[in-house]
């Protein structure tokens, strides 16, 4: 019985290695729950925001934030997660990330955080 179990274990491990080891993954747009916009930025400092939200399960991992500068004072931020296939814990997983916006011109900036379902969260950033 032990030898059958040992052979089964070896075959299972070998098949995982032969298949590449990593399950398939894809990128998806995720929505955020809130965005904290600190104050005190000037045109000589790099501006940033802190976003937070919930992943639907443990297969989601933060990947990146795509920033589109629509014009000088309007910016659209899209949060991207990587979802891997496989066994996942079906629990909400909180996340918090800093998003670097770079140096911005003096004035009132509109930040639009786009979600995957067409909705967005809008915040204002004042650069002195």
Model-derived regions, located:
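Sec-dependent N-terminal signal peptides
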Residues: 4-14
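An anionic, turn-rich surface loop/hairpin at beta-sheet edges
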Residues: 78-103
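A short tyrosine-centered beta-strand micro-motif
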Residues: 109-113
